[in-house]
C-alpha cells in the first residue's frame, strides 16, 4: 500500500520528548500504510525553540540545551531509520515575529533556530540522513523573519511553498 509522500499529524510534540512519543508515531505510520520504501520526514523542534529551550536552561547555556535537545531527537530519528524507513528531517523554519508568550524575541529565536538546525545537520550528516531546511531563506538581513512567509504565529504562508517545493525536489519520484 504505502503512502510515498503524505502528511501524518501526531499532535504537537517536541524534539526533546519525541522518543517518548514513538508509540504514537509508529501507530500513525502503520495506520497510513507507510512502508520501508516511503520517505518519513520528522518535523520537530519549532516548539522546543519557541517555548522550551530558553525557558528551561537550569544553569546551562542555550547552545548546551540545543545540543541536548538535538541529541535526544536523534534517538527518534535513528530508531525510525533502524526500523528500515527512508528517514529525512524537515528542520524547524524561522520563527514567527508574532509569537506571544514565546522565549525572547524573533531575532533570538531565529539565532536559536539556526544553531539548532546547524547541529541537527551535523548529526544527521554523520548518519547519512537528509535534512530539508528553509530557515535561512526566510530570515531577513536584520535577523527577523520575512513576514511574507508567515500566515500567523505558527504556520507558513503559501509564499513559503516554492521554498519547500524546491527543498523537497530531491525526493520526488
Annotate each PLM feature:
Residues 1-72:
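Conserved SGNH/GDSL esterase-like catalytic core that processes O-acyl groups on lipids
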Residues 45-48, 77-111, 136-137:
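Active-site segments of SGNH/GDSL-like serine hydrolases
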Residues 49-63, 96-105, 145-149:
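Surface-exposed, active-site-proximal loop segments in enzymatic domains
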Residues 66-70, 74, 158-169:
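Short, amphipathic alpha-helical "lid/cap" segments that border enzyme active or binding sites
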Residues 70-78, 117, 121:
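Generic structural signal for well-ordered alpha-helices
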Residues 86-92, 114-148, 165-172:
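Extracellular serine-dependent O-acyl
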Residues 97-134, 154, 158-161:
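Substrate-gating cap/lid alpha-helix
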Amino acid at each position: 500500500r504505502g503512502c510515498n509522500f503524505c502528511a501524518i499529524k501526531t499532535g504537537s510534540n517536541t524534539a526533546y520528548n519525541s522518543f517518548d512519543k514513538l508509540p504514537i508515531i509508529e501507530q500513525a505510520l502503520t495506520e497510513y500504510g507507510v512502508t520501508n520504501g516511503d520517505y518519513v520526514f520528522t518535523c520537530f523542534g519549532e516548539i522546543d525553540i519557541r517555548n522550551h529551550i530558553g525557558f528551561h536552561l537550569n544553569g546551562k547555556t542555550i547552545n548546551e540545551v540545543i545540543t541536548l535537545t538535538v541529541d535526544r531527537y536523534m534517538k527518534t530519528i535513528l530508531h525510525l531509520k533502524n526500523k528500515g524507513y527512508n528517514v529525512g528531517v524537515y528542520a524547524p523554519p524561522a520563527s514567527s515575529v508574532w509569537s506571544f508568550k514565546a522565549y525572547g524575541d524573533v531575532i533570538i529565536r531565529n539565532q536559536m533556530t539556526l544553531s539548532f538546525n546547524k547541529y541537527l545537520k551535523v548529526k544527521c550528516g554523520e548518519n547519512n540522513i537528509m535534512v530539508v531546511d528553509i530557515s535561512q531563506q526566510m530570515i531577513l538581513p536584520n535577523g527577523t523573519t520575512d513576514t511574507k512567509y508567515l500566515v500567523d504565529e505558527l504556520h507558513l504562508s503559501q509564499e513559503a511553498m516554492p521554498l519547500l517545493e524546491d527543498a523537497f525536489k530531491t525526493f520526488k519520484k
